[in-house]
């Protein structure tokens, strides 16, 4: 790269190897990693988010891990301001920011100049009342009628984002995604975006294995501890894949086997949304996640 402080973003679906590649690139390029996974922002959400341990970070500085309390509501706008400050501090110190994660809105908030649409408490209250009246799935179906593209990237059982999308649509008179910047504009800081491409035959077994290992490593105990610190089902963290299923198990709604299987299913569903989102961005340089991703990434960057 001509400019050693130009950020590199490593994006792609869950379980594709982003975190390991980020560490390797940081070693090679004198870089520091900036987390772009919304659930890894939460303190104590470790096993279920595949957060790298200190040993796995191999001495590389990782920013924006463990910054939010478990009861806090996630905010892309708040993340954006924090992350921009971190990236620009890394650049001032002459190092390469390595942005790593697959949380779609968070990635775009960082690499694009995304100005967030307005809020209106009365409009939001109206949609929250509608949510309480009909339930999240019916409200999500209404969103799908108004804005199919927004519905395709918002989890079926995510009441907060469903309400927010409907609020934005009403306030702006435009689709929710119209508030996002076009994906053909130059990315902020001229960030180089590398995508880990996967196929279902390769990725699904990795998802299954990773899920099973999560539970073997004490994931249920992790969630139990977080409940003691304020984790509830009706919260941002409580809607996270895996955590939601364990909470359903605690509530007697899922057996152990169902809890594990539903976590796998939820992860595969999320991966489909990630693929759909990222493939629409022509600025992403794709490499094969099943190959030597480090060598391929360096070739792209040279």
Swiss-Prot record:
<feature type="site" description="Interaction with substrate tRNA">
    <location>
        <position position="124"/>
    </location>
</feature>
<keyword id="KW-0460">Magnesium</keyword>
<feature type="site" description="Interaction with substrate tRNA">
    <location>
        <position position="103"/>
    </location>
</feature>
<comment type="similarity">
    <text>Belongs to the IPP transferase family.</text>
</comment>
<dbReference type="InterPro" id="IPR027417">
    <property type="entry name" value="P-loop_NTPase"/>
</dbReference>
<keyword id="KW-0067">ATP-binding</keyword>
<dbReference type="GO" id="GO:0005524">
    <property type="term" value="F:ATP binding"/>
</dbReference>
<feature type="binding site">
    <location>
        <begin position="12"/>
        <end position="19"/>
    </location>
    <ligand>
        <name>ATP</name>
    </ligand>
</feature>
<protein>
    <recommendedName>
        <fullName>tRNA dimethylallyltransferase</fullName>
        <ecNumber>2.5.1.75</ecNumber>
    </recommendedName>
</protein>
<comment type="function">
    <text>Catalyzes the transfer of a dimethylallyl group onto the adenine at position 37 in tRNAs that read codons beginning with uridine, leading to the formation of N6-(dimethylallyl)adenosine (i(6)A).</text>
</comment>
<keyword id="KW-0819">tRNA processing</keyword>
<dbReference type="InterPro" id="IPR039657">
    <property type="entry name" value="Dimethylallyltransferase"/>
</dbReference>
<dbReference type="GO" id="GO:0052381">
    <property type="term" value="F:tRNA dimethylallyltransferase activity"/>
</dbReference>
<comment type="subunit">
    <text>Monomer.</text>
</comment>
<dbReference type="Pfam" id="PF01715">
    <property type="entry name" value="IPPT"/>
</dbReference>
<feature type="region of interest" description="Interaction with substrate tRNA">
    <location>
        <begin position="37"/>
        <end position="40"/>
    </location>
</feature>
<feature type="binding site">
    <location>
        <begin position="14"/>
        <end position="19"/>
    </location>
    <ligand>
        <name>substrate</name>
    </ligand>
</feature>
<dbReference type="InterPro" id="IPR018022">
    <property type="entry name" value="IPT"/>
</dbReference>
<keyword id="KW-0808">Transferase</keyword>
<keyword id="KW-0547">Nucleotide-binding</keyword>
<dbReference type="GO" id="GO:0006400">
    <property type="term" value="P:tRNA modification"/>
</dbReference>
């Amino acid at each position: 790269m001509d400019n050693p402080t130009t950020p590199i973003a490593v994006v792609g679906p869950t379980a594709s190897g982003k975190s390991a590649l980020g560490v390797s690139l940081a070693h090679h390029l004198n870089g520091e990693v900036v987390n772009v996974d919304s659930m890894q922002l939460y303190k104590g959400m470790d096993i279920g988010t595949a957060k790298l341990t200190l040993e796995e970070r191999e001495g590389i500085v990782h920013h924006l891990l463990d910054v939010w309390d478990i009861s806090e509501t996630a905010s892309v706008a708040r993340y954006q301001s924090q992350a921009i400050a971190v990236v620009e501090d890394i650049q001032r110190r002459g190092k390469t920011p390595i942005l790593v994660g697959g949380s779609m809105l968070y990635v775009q908030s960082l690499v694009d100049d995304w100005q967030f649409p307005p809020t209106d408490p009365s409009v939001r209250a109206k949609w929250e009342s509608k949510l309480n009246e009909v339930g999240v799935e019916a409200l999500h179906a209404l969103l799908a009628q108004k804005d199919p593209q927004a519905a395709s990237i918002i989890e079926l059982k995510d009441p907060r984002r469903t309400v927010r999308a409907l609020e934005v649509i009403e306030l702006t008179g435009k689709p929710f995604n119209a508030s996002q910047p076009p994906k053909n504009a130059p990315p902020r800081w001229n960030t180089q975006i590398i995508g880990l491409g996967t196929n279902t035959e390769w990725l699904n077994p990795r998802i299954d294995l990773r899920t099973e290992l999560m539970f073997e490593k004490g994931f249920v105990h992790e969630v139990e501890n977080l409940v003691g610190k304020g984790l509830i089902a009706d919260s941002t963290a409580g809607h996270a894949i895996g955590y939601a299923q364990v909470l359903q198990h605690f509530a007697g709604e899922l057996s152990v086997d169902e809890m594990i299987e539903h976590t796998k299913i939820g992860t595969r569903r999320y991966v489909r949304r990630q693929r759909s989102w990222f493939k629409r961005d022509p600025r992403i340089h794709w490499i094969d996640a099943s190959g030597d991703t480090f060598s391929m990434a360096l070739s792209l960057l040279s």
